[in-house]
Amino acid sequence: MHLNQLVISHLACERGENRLFEGCHFSVSSGEWVQIEGHNGIGKTSLLRILAGLALPVAGEVLWNNLSIHKQRDEYYAELFYLGHYAGIKPELSAWENLRFYQKMQGLSLDDEALWFALDKVSLVERADLPCSYLSAGQQRRVALAKLWLTQQKLWILDEPFTAIDNHGVGDLIMHIERHCSLGGMAIFTSHQTVESNKVRTLSLDQFKL
């Protein structure tokens, strides 16, 4: 099994003229998952966007297998699943059609059983045929979350993945992340909830606040 590593090297992040954090450094290797903690406004979402290559730090760099993510964008994005605050789905398509489109875009097997299983895990089977524009914001986010049961990407970066699901769904997702990491995957996430798992490592951004 090929081992991957994401290294966060002395990152600094600003919002406007306000420096949120600096000197942020840690690493995540295959088999590990890390919860990013910190008080509101410290820059947790900003950090995840930097790790996903969607924003630039004012200092420092992010390395994937010893090379800057910006020097190997195609290779990095091929291994990255990012869930931000926006669902990133097509509102004119149904939940089922969105997941089928995702399977095609990722070159996955067009497996109906896997697709229905993913919808079941986020409690959307009964709404699978509705255009996503008819779904609530929380339900649309669950459509995006269902992709986690389809993706083969190794690195998951998830911003508040538990907000749109009930307690049973939270338990299912935690077990799914644990299984993903046990098979050589890795995950970095934020959450206001306490994650009941002895396998998760926590990192507080507060320690990097000026």
UniProtKB/Swiss-Prot annotation:
It holds the Pfam family ABC_tran. It catalyses: heme b(in) + ATP + H2O = heme b(out) + ADP + phosphate + H(+). InterPro entries: ABC_transporter-like_ATP-bd (IPR003439), ABC_transporter-like_CS (IPR017871), ABC_transptr_haem_export_CcmA (IPR005895), P-loop_NTPase (IPR027417). Keywords: ATP-binding, Cell inner membrane, Cell membrane, Cytochrome c-type biogenesis, Membrane, Nucleotide-binding, Translocase, Transport. Residues 1-208 form the ABC transporter domain. It is found in: Cell inner membrane. GO terms for molecular function: ABC-type heme transporter activity; ATP binding; ATP hydrolysis activity. GO terms for biological process: cytochrome complex assembly. ATP binds at residues 38-45. Its main location: membrane. It is an enzyme of class 7 (translocase). It comes from the Bacteria. One of its GO terms (cellular component) is plasma membrane. The complex is composed of two ATP-binding proteins (CcmA) and two transmembrane proteins (CcmB). Part of the ABC transporter complex CcmAB involved in the biogenesis of c-type cytochromes; once thought to export heme, this seems not to be the case, but its exact role is uncertain. Responsible for energy coupling to the transport system. Belongs to the ABC transporter superfamily. CcmA exporter (TC 3.A.1.107) family. This is Cytochrome c biogenesis ATP-binding export protein CcmA. The lineage of its organism: Bacteria, Pseudomonadati, Pseudomonadota, Gammaproteobacteria, Pasteurellales.
